[in-house]
Amino acid sequence: MTAGLFWIAGAYLLGSIPTGLLLGKLYGIDVRNEGSGNIGATNLYRTVGRKVGILTLTGDCLKGLLPVLLAWKLGHAEPMQAWVGLAAFCGHVFSVFLLFKGGKGVATALGVFLALAPLAVLGALAVFILLVAVWRYISLGSIMAAAVMPLIIFFRPHSPQLLIATVLIAAVVIIKHHSNISRLIAGTESKFKA
């Protein structure tokens, strides 16, 4: 039990590292005051540039991927891996270094699920790519990919703990997109430009 709490706390602290904020500051920009104000890859892409956006995406994804892979490598079963992944995700969204504020969690969730359920990621990624290709809204693709992920996990042979973690992650991702949802409804959401 103590080892499990250690892993969960460590994953949370790793997830709490604000990748986008730190990369933005390297370029003299506080992304919380630019664009959407979000510290995630999409805002970095739009306000700082493509390279920094991709670096942010990679860093945020690794924050979810690495602790889960390490827990797996050290012999922890899927239920503990799921809690470790949830902790890393919560660290990103509710960062201890940002007074429990943070990003929307999409890239970190991607990393978590690449480690825990890579086949399920393919299904969610297909939904994301299709919606972004047709409507050009990153937020819509992210919201719908999050929404389908628990359904995919439900129909795959995974532990109940992973399903619970997936439902919680999906719910938080969708809730964190509340302002995007309002803009989508109003027709004022920014479209993705490659």
UniProtKB/Swiss-Prot annotation:
Catalyzes the transfer of an acyl group from acyl-phosphate (acyl-PO(4)) to glycerol-3-phosphate (G3P) to form lysophosphatidic acid (LPA). This enzyme utilizes acyl-phosphate as fatty acyl donor, but not acyl-CoA or acyl-ACP. The chain crosses the membrane at residues 3-23, 52-72, 80-100, 112-132, 135-155, 162-182. One of its GO terms (cellular component) is plasma membrane. It is an enzyme of class 2 (transferase). It catalyses: an acyl phosphate + sn-glycerol 3-phosphate = a 1-acyl-sn-glycero-3-phosphate + phosphate. Its EC number is 2.3.1.275. Keywords: Cell inner membrane, Cell membrane, Lipid biosynthesis, Lipid metabolism, Membrane, Phospholipid biosynthesis, Phospholipid metabolism, Transferase, Transmembrane, Transmembrane helix. It is found in: Cell inner membrane. It comes from the Bacteria. This is Glycerol-3-phosphate acyltransferase. Its main location: membrane. Probably interacts with PlsX. Belongs to the PlsY family. The gene is plsY. It is a multi-pass membrane protein. GO terms for biological process: phospholipid biosynthetic process. Pfam families: G3P_acyltransf. It comes from Trichlorobacter lovleyi (strain ATCC BAA-1151 / DSM 17278 / SZ) (Geobacter lovleyi). Pathway: Lipid metabolism; phospholipid metabolism. PANTHER family: GLYCEROL-3-PHOSPHATE ACYLTRANSFERASE-RELATED, INNER MEMBRANE PROTEIN YGIH.
